[in-house]
């Protein structure tokens, strides 16, 4: 599972850099200030969790069910949270808002909270 966490850490890190540059250089002319701020929030959370997965991938070396749940919750949470924001912002900018993505963002946030909560639990 550590290899998967490290793989996703690298993927999230690389795509966050790409999407951050995309937002800063291309989307800034097409998005409102509010939309750009939302897009940047997605990028920030993605890079934060890339770093967390990278650190945990090297630190949590035991293959326990709890570590697996932590990794999965953080990976699923990052995908649902950040990528739903990207979809909402880009579709909204094209006047074709994809409404079903709206409820996905907080579900992603819940997965992130679960991952952090499980990590906290391992230290208790």
Give residue spans per PLM region.
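Polytopic transmembrane helical bundles with strong interfacial aromatic enrichment
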Residues: 1-124
